[in-house]
Amino acid sequence: ATINGFPFNSQIELLKTHIKKMAELKPDAFIVAAPGVVRLCREIAPQIDIHLSTQANVLNYLDAQVFWDMGVKRIVVAREISLKDVMEIKKHLPDMEIEIFVHGSMCFAYSGRCLISAVQMGRVPNRGSCANDCRFEYTLYAGNDEHGSLFRLEEEPGVGTYIFNSKDMNLASHIQEILDSGAVDSLKIEGRTKSPYYAAVTAKAYREAIDDYYAGKFEPEKYQKELHTTKNRGFTDAYLIHKPFEKTDSQNHDYALSKGSYEVTGLV
């Protein structure tokens, strides 16, 4: 059950009621981001496990330790983390379950730490209503304060740029490294706003990758061929192997519309 928003003071009492109602449904866990909400869940429904959301942006073992001490059983680490850092967290907290994102959209900021959507559209990312303003086409201007002139910067005549647009994460080719690390307990695939076709294909591809790894016949090309049939904005392995700022291929400045080699034509 997801409760990973960041509530205002005026919503605390409603949140308490919400947690009680959710607990009655006996979910496997609450996915929470805010430290105060973690504590509230522990007080109201101590029988429900707490999984820390990727929105909490955990990148190191110090932050992980804080949440472990609060009673968090599993951390979905930040999308921006490297496998080396995941292994370091596991080394310091061997009993903490670690879940990583392996596939799906990426934020151009640390996950959800962006107010562009809130400022332009009144829709706040960390409150579950991001309008994906980073996917819009923007036009750049250069100004001259002395003369008061403004010049439009163009890569092509009349064409703007998708300067904030991130590619999609795709770590299927790195499943062997991830599982070899012994530090990861669960793999997470983004499903929000995705089609049933997308969910089915991605889940199938990663299930095959995991099973093939344990069977000793890991074939990255096979999984990638299947994954490229889904809608995507171009793929990147993000920061799993490379730390932030060491990679330059995580942005797609050419287009924001998701493209795939297959189109769904009907449901059977």
For the regions a protein language model found, what residue spans apply to each?
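N-terminal active-site wall of soluble small-molecule enzyme domains
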Residues: 6-25, 29-66
